[in-house]
Amino acid sequence: MPGTSDILHNDVVIFNFPYPERWDSIGFDVMLYYAKRCIALPGDTLEIKNGHYRVSGYGGSLGNIESQDELARIMSTEQGVQWLIKQNCYYAYPFDSLLNWNIKELGPLYIPRAGDQIHLEHSSVVLYRQLIEWEQGAKLTEQKGCYQLGGNEITNYTFQKNYYFMGGDKTENSRDSRYWGLLPEEYIVGKVWRIWKSIDKSTGTTRWERIWKKIG
């Protein structure tokens, strides 16, 4: 997308959802769009601490703080954590038993940018396998501690694309990068500046008072 270099932290972005069929493999559905807030940019290192987003070197707030506070309140009790587990929304990307990340404590997670190189080991492969396979159109496999990409042995990998971490404003109920991973730059359609449609889920009626309101 032209102008993706202008995307900043907290911008609301519309994009083609990159995981339409399964969360471990990037695909494409031209009719499936999401709108989420940009939490982390290419080159950022992101963490989630007690449900709140943190990006190394960035001093401002990220995402909907009130919603993150509410999520932290829910997770402050074992009952709240168990409720989230039953809702299948507590454990987080990349759903690996060794990392054991969840929406309360996640990271640090580096957000790749084009030209970045990583060494292939268990943690890096778990985090970035789907990106590597999507960029190369080949399977990344492991045998006896050695990795092969499309049948060729590989020890390091250089990313060809930029990626973003996206978060929904309803932190306690949003299927975002905490669950499905990172967003490739070319899936971005543009920024969202104003609300053009708002439907009350309980009644199915249009919330006219929200139409054309500027998104902050």
What name fits each language-model region?
Residues M1-G216:
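Soluble "head" domains of membrane/secretory-pathway proteins
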